[in-house]
Design a protein with these regions (language model features):
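Mg2+-dependent endonuclease catalytic cores in nucleic-acid-processing enzymes, primarily RNase H-like
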Residues: 51-183, 228-233
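Residue-level signal for short segments within beta-strands and strand-turn junctions
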Residues: 49-51, 209
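ATPase catalytic-site recognition across NTP-hydrolyzing enzymes
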Residues: 1-35, 49
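Acidic two-metal-ion nuclease catalytic site recognized across multiple nuclease folds
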Residues: 6, 12, 17, 60, ...
Length: 233
């Protein structure tokens, strides 16, 4: 299906091809949205939905209109509740680095106004340190750590990917090396974009949708507004 890989790519192509969705998605017990916000006008903003570890690409919007992205998230949350009769918490995991912060802020405003109930907003800042002490001994940065979560899920057949050629190409193209301290280090988004000619926006949205492995399925008593203590292990 795809050309032969280099030896230093992080996601084995055979593993990705074996993880493609071919069946209908059943009713979900757990649902997350991964939101990768475009950094530049030529990039895509992508929303990936993860229901019971079955992942779909729900919205791909070219460019960086932040308020349209907020609207897309609100509509997707509404659709999940209506289409799947979903009554549990929806976790919206956003790349909060740079422009993504504007999406996070507006969604939290809507929550404070009572217009986005049953939703927890989880910002992920990719310039921050790896949040897990044990993982920080193995992974150079939070990008490498986040991608490792998806890779581990795919290896254990705990996640199913959509049949999307561009997504698989992005996932199978990202390279890695070892830092001087022996930690796994994925190439930067900028370096990958320069090398392959596009930003791995679909891949990053899928990675974000799987970051919920580090989220407790609870909310703060008496409130559906998530805090750091309510969603991080």
């Amino acid at each position: 299906m795809f050309p032969k890989q280099d030896d230093d790519v992080y996601m084995p192509l055979e593993m990705l091809e074996a993880s493609i969705i071919l069946e209908e998605i059943p009713p979900a017990d757990i649902c997350t949205l991964g939101v990768d916000v475009a950094r530049f006008a030529e990039d895509d903003t992508v929303i990936a939905r993860n229901m019971n570890k079955k992942i779909t690409l729900e919205k791909i919007r070219h460019g960086q209109d932040l308020m349209k992205t907020v609207g897309d998230v609100v509509v997707e949350c509404r659709n999940i509740k209506e289409k799947f009769k979903y009554k549990k918490t929806i976790y919206v995991i956003i790349d909060d680095t740079g422009l993504g912060g504007g999406v996070t802020d507006r969604l939290n405003e809507l929550k404070s106004e009572g217009k986005l109930s049953g939703v927890v907003i989880v910002p992920v800042n990719f310039s921050a340190a790896v949040p897990d002490k044990k993982a920080a001994e193995k992974y150079h940065d939070i990008t490498s750590y986040a991608w490792s979560i998806l890779r581990d899920m795919l290896e254990e057949k705990e996640a199913v990917l959509p049949n999307d050629t561009e997504l698989i190409a992005q996932l199978s193209a990202r390279k890695y090396d070892l830092s001087s301290s022996g930690k796994i280090r994925l190439e930067s988004k900028k370096a990958m974009k320069e090398r392959i000619g596009e930003s791995p926006d679909r891949a990053d949205a899928v990675v974000l949708s799987c970051y919920r492995n580090k989220i407790k399925p609870i909310s703060v008593p008496g409130s559906d507004v998530g805090t750091k203590d309510s969603y991080w292990r």
